[in-house]
């Protein structure tokens, strides 16, 4: 008894095998996590260091460079960028995809420890790190609002009570709080009153620090009791500081309230946050690199009542924005496409076989194969995401192929007079090797994908494993369950309750007769057909060169990020007004649902906005159209620019640019970089292939440059360090004392009252008390002039860097933009000391584009090797592969027709076509070789008979695969921009391939047979058989 007979004769065992596959698949489906895409995030660690009051250039030289030299030695770092601004340095380390984030964090900590001795001694704390990418869009934004509490109090609640609890949620990588700063006692000094009293700013500082000292005072005890000694040595509120005596003058006390305004405020008054136009504290939550967005947000939502319980009455905690609704909607759309695809595939089978009994067989085998695949997805540690669901949708079109080939062949034997049982045995034996060849060669396409690295490799890997698993399960079902069901369900036509001859059946017969006549003509004019095939190959090359290319389709996630960039000399008050104006304009758009934003911190000329659009079904336009509309309205706002970009699921690089793509200029000479960056930016801004061109080069800030008269200072008894201390006390929002509270530590902040520090004339009011006790005005030993100074200094690697960000205009492609940038750089004639390189997603595109052709050739070579092994022939694998050029032309023409650029998703479609379209040739070649060997027919008669005999199954399998891809090609709704390129590629490729290969494959077969006969007198060994 053969293996096929075993399954046909034991229906219970075969049915239970299928049931077991289904149950295991359902269990896997239930346990599968849900995500927008496969896990493709680079491990990223952010290092932060601070030195209050230090300029951007000082931070870059004394803090960033020592840290970069130490961190650059860590294994697996593929990109290191840093940004230094007033008092802070931030270094972003991006690691290789295969680097474990926890191991990388240990290496980072070791490098920070090694670099500690090289850092300035005045740093208030050691550098710290976080395992999160600051350039990622938050997965959720919480807002804290209240009519009873101040912004400082709300910030305190958020940072003290909420941030730590949220950070403990599994999957959360970083929690940042914006919109204000911690509460503080603020001392705003009156320089005129101090001068009149002959009291220096440092005297005030020392008096405050001495009055607020908390030290352990010990305990007293007798034989039976013990008392802890405590005192009121700490001053905690503004009210307690006001009567503080600074000094005595002529026997009279000088109190703090006599020379300063004391209030309960915040540490940094130059921060503002808003939500929908109202003041709010923003809690931005980013996930860790390996976390699942949906699971993380679900945990956050479940913990929300407990978080609200930590807050006092009158404080509202709300989720202002959440990225998961559009992700869930996108997955629902793919699930609907999958259901439609399965229904269409089964309809194709019904229309061709015209039998409800026959249609029931693929109606069972297709779901079993697809459900069983879910178990494989779970065992491999993957998720249920857009790509894996698209893979299942496409699989619905070709897992039915195996069942169709077996079913159609068995049905043909029944029509020829065999009993269903004998027809099942004969039919499955006859096509078993063919089905095996189709499945194995289809799976072979994905072998090169498993060796790809980077983000494309991660995407392809999961897609390839999913499809390979579906192919393997489909093959098993086709050779076991399908023949068993055929033996039990199929009946001869005269006893079957199937449909009688219909117009469709007559049309099918007419098509077959027409094909027979046209095939004869084609074989008589084989040379012209061969020339046509060569022309198709040339057309492939031209189309691939001509088609616009991009890395990944622009997604509409329903979320936009806005970056406000104002004049580098703008004040905080003016910047806050710009933020309010921009938020008002954006909120007025009919497609916008929610807007949050903040400004302040070390870069007072910038701000950030997070915009949630209405659900796709409730708005009239997609994200890119909304951006274009807002860009027009926002262009009339003077003094600042708002750059908008749609949040994407795939983003690389740690630098937070103003747009989706980056081009970085590098130089070891900062002067060269600063000279050429404006010229390069101007040239790129003039390119029509780019839009929203901006730069992170902030070197036009205004400063007052002081020049000390050192001989005069020596004569007056004044030290440079004393002058620097004076200026820090006056203008640096200096934290001069610490307030220790049960839940947090706060500070006393001292500076000159902002009313006396609005312009450069504030320096005229500064004075210092020399060693002789005389008040000496600053102008007595120093002069100053306005000058330009960098607000930030950026590095990449160990070189000075300036990153130019850009978006693409509507209909633009990344390949056109890349070519235009390359030509512009060549035309500028930049010096060798200035290097230009793409960064982030644009760099990934460059890397992926260089390997695309190699990947396609590797897949073709793998298929050739597998087919050569199966058929023991060097020649006929070429016959089978001759079907590929027509599929490529169809796919590329379809993409161009629908104005879709060639992306990674389209490349996945091309790889699928390599596996799909060759099955037609396999069916023909396999039957032709068998007819030559067993019936001793000539090559022409054998291929002619094979074409007519396999016309119906070829038509059925191609239409099944085509109809399986149609729901993707014509999909709409959330996530359609991901599904459409895949569906368009497959539908276009299958259509053109189906038309051409029915004629080119027989011609190529004849030429290959002539070639084989010429070079070998011996007949090729027969292929492997069961």
Swiss-Prot record:
A Pfam family per the record: ACR_tran
Superkingdom classification of source: Bacteria
Keywords: Cell inner membrane, Cell membrane, Membrane, Transmembrane, Transmembrane helix, Transport
Record GO terms (molecular function): xenobiotic transmembrane transporter activity
Membrane topology, record value: Multi-pass membrane protein
Subcellular location: Cell inner membrane
One GO location term (cellular component): plasma membrane
Spans traversing the lipid bilayer: 16-36, 333-353, 360-380, 387-407, 435-455, 459-479, 528-548, 853-873, 897-917, 953-973, 984-1004
Quaternary context: Part of a tripartite efflux system composed of MdtA, MdtB and MdtC. MdtC forms a heteromultimer with MdtB.
Family from the record: Belongs to the resistance-nodulation-cell division (RND) (TC 2.A.6) family. MdtC subfamily.
The protein, known as: Multidrug resistance protein MdtC
Organism per entry: Edwardsiella ictaluri (strain 93-146)
